[in-house]
């Protein structure tokens, strides 16, 4: 089975590019960030501070995650509820980064993520796919861009959705998540030694897509 690992910081465009690449190659796309977002959402709904590891650990036995791939798109279910849309807020994104630093949460999700890769060709994106989840992935890509470029893209997405958030706030959030993701003790964000680096700061979506498609094709034929 072929496995493609795409890692990188928040707002690098991993999910958007990964969806398109998976559709192009006919692979199943697994968005691991959605899993952490779902844990973060559950913590927020339970009135718990996502950074409080002990409080979040106590919630894990009450959480059942299920996945469905509908027309190649991953849908995630939290205790039977489709939360695929509910998890896409900035607040939940920050909560995801916080629970992502929790070793118990990472362990809770790790086997789930690995099991999804066993029976099928997959393309998985996240923060530690190439380093921890799929260390023997067929292809590893580390996707990045400057904080300013990533904040600009995210701000434009918010504008299109009618969310009026100042650019400065978006940039501050991006930088805060970068710090949290790179400084956590459990599986910090870093480039795998055998990953190919792609900086998309000066590339548009199509250019980034073609560059990644070429990287994958060169490895898998």
Go through each PLM region and give its residues:
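Pre-Walker A (Motif I) flank of P-loop NTPase domains
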Residues: 1-3, 119
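Hydrophobic anchor at the beta1->P-loop junction of P-loop NTPases
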Residues: 6
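ATP-dependent NMP and nucleoside kinases share a basic, alpha-helical "lid"
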Residues: 84-161
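Small-molecule kinase domains that catalyze NTP-dependent phosphoryl transfer to phosphate-bearing small molecules
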Residues: 68, 113-120, 132, 136, ...
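N-terminal phosphate/diphosphate-binding loop that engages ATP/GTP or pyrophosphate donors
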Residues: 23-89
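Hydrophobic positions on the alpha1 helix immediately C-terminal to the Walker A/P-loop
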Residues: 17
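Walker A (P-loop) phosphate-binding loop of P-loop NTPases
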Residues: 11
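Conserved lysine of the Walker
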Residues: 14
């Amino acid at each position: 089975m072929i496995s493609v690992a795409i890692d990188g910081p928040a707002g690098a465009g991993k999910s958007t590019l990964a969806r398109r690449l998976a559709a192009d190659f006919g692979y199943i796309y697994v968005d691991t960030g959605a899993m952490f977002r779902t844990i973060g959402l559950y913590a927020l709904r339970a009135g718990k501070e996502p950074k409080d590891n002990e409080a979040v650990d106590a919630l894990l036995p009450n959480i059942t995650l299920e996945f469905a791939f509908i027309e190649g798109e991953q849908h995630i279910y939290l205790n039977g509820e489709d939360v695929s849309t509910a998890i896409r807020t900035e607040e939940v994104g920050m909560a995801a980064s916080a629970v992502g630093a929790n070793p118990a949460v990472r362990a809770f999700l790790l086997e789930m993520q690995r099991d999804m890769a066993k029976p099928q060709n997959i393309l998985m994106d996240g923060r530690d796919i190439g380093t921890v989840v799929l260390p023997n992935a067929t292809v590893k890509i580390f996707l990045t861009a400057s904080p300013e470029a990533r904040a600009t893209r995210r701000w434009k997405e918010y504008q299109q959705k009618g969310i009026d958030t100042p650019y400065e706030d978006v940039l501050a959030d991006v930088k805060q998540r970068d710090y949290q993701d790179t400084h956590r003790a459990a599986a910090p964000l870093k480039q795998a030694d055998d990953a190919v680096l792609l900086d998309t700061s000066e590339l548009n979506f199509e250019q980034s897509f073609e560059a990644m498609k070429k990287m994958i094709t060169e490895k898998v034929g």
